[in-house]
């Protein structure tokens, strides 16, 4: 492993289990429990992407779903998924990821020349420069401008993945399984309510795994383990991890999307 990784700490990783993965064609190693972002950082990778327009170098900005820079393309072939946040990708055997929005490579991006001409490429420059000169001129340059725009590339062939939907009914829905969410779930469960706890991360507990201090006289991570175990043992509580609630609609209907198999090299038969 690289010397960039701390010798201790990291409660969610298993240092005894090493995992090989590939990024931009190069093989790296991480640990079980790593995200793609944390494993790349530990390997000495600090450049994760290029800015949308001027292709300026970009590194990690955050450690979760709010990450704006480290957008990668996962899985080769028809299962390809673009624009995935490296901070949300769980490391697993066989993981293949590629950077986006660069040519020919992340470290040497010819499109970075745009930065040299940024004064001439202000917002909406193409409307003033090309569209006012007549249709033939715009139609000529439109092809090149559209090819330079965007981040990841979507495939044009059929999507071979399967998507299922279901309905769940509950008395109390809690979005976010951090300390407040876990406490709220326990209180509702103690009152005899049917409780559904949803969190987009792979592990409940939120910042309790990262921050020091105590909760109810226990270190934060120990309290998190105990609270999660308590909720999992209750028949009236359901924990849904890797699930993002994306909308709140009329009549108390909420929409949620669960990542079922993205963290596995070989999904189960019906995933």
Go through each PLM region and give its residues.
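N-terminal Rossmann-like FAD-binding beta1-loop-alpha1 element of flavoenzymes
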Residues: 166-196
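Glycine-rich phosphate-binding loops of nucleotide-dependent enzymes
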Residues: 214
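Ferredoxin-like iron-sulfur electron-transfer modules
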Residues: 22, 160-169
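Feature captures the FAD/FMN-dependent oxidoreductase FAD-binding
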Residues: 112, 148-152, 166, 173, ...
